[in-house]
Design a protein with these regions (language model features):
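Membrane-interface helix-loop junctions and terminal tails of multi-pass membrane proteins
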Residues: 1-283
């Protein structure tokens, strides 16, 4: 006899999404803060690895309660191409954005004296173009050489790759079951994407990861430039909408190009059903 497990409430799932997203932002932006104002010495690969491990730890923390989406783009894609309940979607997204905001706020609070010292030493005024150097500790801004359209395309492509591989790693029909290794492999995937494409857009791939910290820097004194990135258009819209488009494309591509072609077990027929002695029955 099997015992049915009680499913977590929606409020518990949202709390898990809040905590998981806050944790990954805490580790990721904390690493960048250490580099920018703390005197640490990290290369691109080390930063990408820390972001990836932070995501892995957040997944391990929350997967059993909420499924560890930790990303509105993932939640939206799963609501369209998987069995995630659409009624939960707005609550998950709000929890993820709030978690990202609080994770960034916690890092800012802990490093605040170092931020002030850096600004005084470099005669930096918040809200100016120069202050984007420190605002980028918390959220992403594109390489100046990229147009806005190119930045949008980069985020679409890398998020599509992220979503497609996430679906493959969590699909037990696709090769050997990944089980407890899946979060580590997802973290490694993020590190690989970050180390290869990070210099272009900062590899947001997550609307909450970018918008929540941008909101925090807006209130912390950076103001409007937090959202525009010093461009003529509100750049914050790019890492909000491009990952959503990319995640949906990645999920659709996995479903259409990979999942539908995976071998699946055929239902047993009467003629093929084994007898007690192990030999097949014949009609």
């Amino acid at each position: 006899m099997t015992t049915a497990l009680q499913q977590p409430s929606l409020s518990s799932q949202c709390m898990a999404e809040f905590l998981g997203t806050a944790l990954l932002i805490f580790f990721g932006t904390g690493c960048v803060a250490a580099l920018k104002v703390g005197g640490a010495s990290f290369g691109l690969w080390e930063i990408s690895i820390i972001w990836g491990v932070g995501v892995s730890m957040a997944i391990y923390l929350t997967a059993g309660v909420s499924g560890a989406h930790l990303n509105p783009a993932v939640s939206i894609a799963l609501s369209i191409f998987a069995d995630f309940e659409k009624r939960k979607l707005p609550f998950y997204i709000l929890a993820q954005i709030a978690g990202a905001f609080c994770g960034a706020l916690l890092v800012y609070t802990l490093y605040s004296n170092l931020f002030f010292d850096y600004e005084q030493t470099h005669h930096m005024v918040r809200g100016t173009q120069a202050s984007l150097e420190l605002a980028s500790v918390f959220s992403t801004f594109p390489n100046p050489a990229l147009t806005t359209a190119q930045a949008f395309l980069v985020e679409v492509i890398i998020t599509a790759i992220l979503m497609g591989v996430i679906m493959s790693l969590t699909d037990d029909n696709n090769g050997l079951p990944k089980g407890p290794l899946a979060p580590l492999l997802i973290g490694l995937l993020i590190a690989v994407i970050g180390s290869s494409m990070g210099p272009l857009t900062g590899f947001a791939m997550n609307p909450a990861r970018d918008f929540g910290p941008k909101l925090m820097t807006f209130f912390a004194g950076w103001g409007e430039i937090s959202f525009t990135g010093g461009r003529d258009i509100p750049y914050f819209l790019i890492p909000v909408f491009a990952p959503i488009v990319g995640a949906c494309l990645g999920a659709a591509a996995y479903r259409g190009l990979i999942a539908r072609h995976l071998p699946s077990a055929l239902p047993a027929t009467k003629d093929a059903a084994p007898a007690i002695d192990g030999k097949p029955r014949t009609s």
